[in-house]
Amino acid sequence: MAASAAALRRSLAGAQQGRPFGPPVAGSSEFPALARRSTVSIAQGEERRKNVYTALQAIDRELREKMKGKRYVVIKPNFVNVFNQLASSHADAMRGILDYLSESFQGPVVIAESSAGDTRRGFDNFRFQALTREYARQQVKLIDLNDEAKFETVALLDADLHIVPCRIAARLVDPEAFVISSAVLKTHNTVIASLSIKNMVLGAPLHAPNSVRPSWSDKRKYHVGLRQTHYNMMVTAQRLDWGASLIDGFEGMEGNGPSSGTPVASRIAIASADYVAADRVAAETMGMDPEWLGYVKYCGQLGLGQFDPARIDVIGAKIADVQKKYRMHPDIDRELQWRGPMTELTPNLGWTHALGDERRG
């Protein structure tokens, strides 16, 4: 018994100094690798609408398979700022998606968003209303998820690492809907980059309709600490598990994203039936290390999608040919602190102290 305890103390001490715990148990892995391959398409050109259509058409077979049995499609745009077009989804990106769906899906289409601001104002400012007329045959409707006020609940961690309930839009987890995350290629002020996962998981939480007082917003429950944010995003992605991702990088955003950065003329669109693979490839097109994106890596480790580049097939344009070095947010050093040791709480807790951990907080 004493020998076993001493061995465990040595193993723990090695881990604390950056050395591995030791050889893995034969046949086991902390996070089993996802064996299946995933495909990500990249389209590049001088027309946003055409890029989006081309990127989706390139993975048509995969998308049609996932759309089987679905009653309707939900397109989830990004309206992080209902006044700044650069920060938000463009109507021409919607047209590219709707052009593709007109050929591949027989059923109504809903464009649904839960902006942190006034979603209806975003529909007006970015001229989404015209889409309902142009695509009347597809019965396109615009829905403010905050006004719809139907929700399910997911458990998150708060700033004190206690669990709290969060209301997420029921329509985004409707088993009868094929959900497309229509994101924008942007840097971010907390989680390094805002891509298809970020678009979904921070668009899903609801806030009070504008007519309701006192107001409330469950989106705030994600902004409770760097580590908690990445974890909470993973938990929410696991619950949502949508069908396809489309990332519009015709004009990306660098610097002070996701709302106030400056434009980058990447002139691309990225599409995949695997949102983890889509976000990994998107990060590479921005010239950043995908390992920086904790929430994307966590989703990959959980098996929600493919994070291993050796198992991702990129079709269309090559990453190296479209890659641009995006300028990161000014707070990038702070944002990356999630990767290091946790110093917010003393590590000298419970059984580690009993086994000889003499660290002091």
Task: Give the residues covered by each predicted segment.
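N-terminal and secondary-structure boundary signal
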Residues: 1-361
